[in-house]
C-alpha cells in the first residue's frame, strides 16, 4: 500500500472515529461526515486516474455531487434544529412527531 493511500485511509478512519465520538452534536457529525466524503473523493480520484478508463473518470464527480447534496440537507436540518431548539444536539430530534 502506497503512503498516499495509507494517509487517505487514515483520514477516513479518523473521521469515522470522530463520527462515533461526537455523535451527540449535529455540527461535529456533519464535519466528520464531510471529512469522510472528501477522503473517499480523493481516493476514488486517484484510482480513476490510474485506471485510464473513460467510465471511471465520472465516478469522482458523482461522489462530489452526492456529497454536496448531503451537505445541503445536513445544513438545512442544522438550521432548522438550531432555530427550533437553540441547540445542535441530535437527541432533540424525534422522528415520530409530525
Curated annotation (Swiss-Prot):
UniProt topology in membrane: Multi-pass membrane protein
InterPro entries recorded: NADH_UbQ_OxRdtase_chain4L/K, NUOK/Mnh_C1-like
Entry's Gene Ontology BP terms: ATP synthesis coupled electron transport
Membrane-spanning ranges: 1-21, 26-46, 61-81
Superkingdom of origin: Eukaryota
Subcellular localization, as worded in the UniProt entry: Mitochondrion inner membrane
One MF annotation (Gene Ontology) recorded for this entry: NADH dehydrogenase (ubiquinone) activity
GO cellular component, one term: mitochondrial inner membrane
Enzyme nomenclature, EC number: 7.1.1.2
Catalytic activity, as annotated: a ubiquinone + NADH + 5 H(+)(in) = a ubiquinol + NAD(+) + 4 H(+)(out)
One Pfam family this sequence matches: Oxidored_q2
Alphabetical keyword list: Electron transport, Membrane, Mitochondrion, Mitochondrion inner membrane, NAD, Respiratory chain, Translocase, Transmembrane, Transmembrane helix, Transport, Ubiquinone
First-tier enzyme category under EC: translocase
Main location: mitochondrion
Secretion signal, residue range per the UniProt entry: none
Stated role: Core subunit of the mitochondrial membrane respiratory chain NADH dehydrogenase (Complex I) which catalyzes electron transfer from NADH through the respiratory chain, using ubiquinone as an electron acceptor. Part of the enzyme membrane arm which is embedded in the lipid bilayer and involved in proton translocation.
Oligomeric and partner information: Core subunit of respiratory chain NADH dehydrogenase (Complex I) which is composed of 45 different subunits.
Family to which this protein belongs: Belongs to the complex I subunit 4L family.
The protein's name: NADH-ubiquinone oxidoreductase chain 4L
Species of the source: Chlorocebus sabaeus (Green monkey)
Lineage, top ranks: Eukaryota, Metazoa, Chordata, Craniata, Vertebrata
Gene responsible for this protein: MT-ND4L
Amino acid at each position: 500500500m502506497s503512503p498516499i493511500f495509507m494517509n487517505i485511509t487514515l483520514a477516513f478512519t479518523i473521521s469515522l472515529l470522530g463520527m462515533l465520538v461526537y455523535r451527540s452534536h449535529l455540527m461535529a457529525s456533519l464535519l466528520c461526515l464531510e471529512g469522510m466524503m472528501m477522503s473517499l473523493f480523493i481516493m476514488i480520484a486517484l484510482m480513476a486516474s490510474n485506471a485510464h478508463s473513460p467510465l471511471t473518470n465520472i465516478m469522482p464527480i458523482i461522489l462530489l455531487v452526492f456529497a454536496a447534496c448531503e451537505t445541503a440537507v445536513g445544513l438545512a436540518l442544522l438550521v432548522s434544529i438550531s432555530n427550533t431548539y437553540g441547540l445542535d444536539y441530535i437527541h432533540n430530534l424525534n422522528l415520530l412527531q409530525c
